[in-house]
Amino acid sequence: MATIEGTFVNSSSLRVAIVIARFNDLITNKLLSGCMDCLSRHGIDVSESSNQLDIAWVPGSFELPIISQKLARNGNYDVVITLGAVIRGDTPHFDVVVSEASKGIATVSRETGVPIIFGVLTTDTMQQALERAGIKNNLGWSYALQALEMGSLMKAVN
């Protein structure tokens, strides 16, 4: 029986795209910072001149799937990380955005065969979002680790 796992040992050959929502950018910028820190510490060049990392900005979390799909289909990336923050309000808009973003991101991953990391915070309050984006810990770091593991695992499986 073979055990196949992704590793974090040598991530320097991975090409990563990050698709990030501008809406709630107080939160998404913090997630991006945590993500970039993790990628950098694991051998990904995050400099402005990097050929390993590209970042695409979209208006909100609802738009994450379409740009993730475009990037995944072009064959330039081993993994795509999506970053967004949807905070519950007084209307059902939250439920629609979260549902469509999550289904869309999962569909893109299945249809393209490229791991798409779901890095969208879904919280009831701004305080909860802030706690997940840096006050207590930064889930951007975790999303980057997931990306590195999945990128490595996909190479191991192929």
UniProtKB/Swiss-Prot annotation:
Domain of life (superkingdom): Bacteria
Alphabetical list of CDD domains matching this protein: Lumazine_synthase-I (cd09209)
Catalytic activity: (2S)-2-hydroxy-3-oxobutyl phosphate + 5-amino-6-(D-ribitylamino)uracil = 6,7-dimethyl-8-(1-D-ribityl)lumazine + phosphate + 2 H2O + H(+)
GO molecular function terms noted in the UniProt entry: 6,7-dimethyl-8-ribityllumazine synthase activity
Protein's UniProt keywords contain Heme: no
Active-site residues from the entry: H93 (proton donor)
Pfam family, one: DMRL_synthase
Record GO biological process: riboflavin biosynthetic process
Keywords: Riboflavin biosynthesis, Transferase
Keyword Transferase: yes
Gene Ontology terms: cellular component: cytosol; riboflavin synthase complex
EC numbers on record: 2.5.1.78
Residues that, per the record, bind 5-amino-6-(D-ribitylamino)uracil: F23, S61, F62, E63, A85, V86, I87, F118
Task performed by this protein: Catalyzes the formation of 6,7-dimethyl-8-ribityllumazine by condensation of 5-amino-6-(D-ribitylamino)uracil with 3,4-dihydroxy-2-butanone 4-phosphate. This is the penultimate step in the biosynthesis of riboflavin.
HAMAP family: Lumazine_synth
Family membership: Belongs to the DMRL synthase family.
Name the UniProt record assigns to this protein: 6,7-dimethyl-8-ribityllumazine synthase
Taxonomic source organism: Prochlorococcus marinus (strain NATL2A)
Gene: ribH
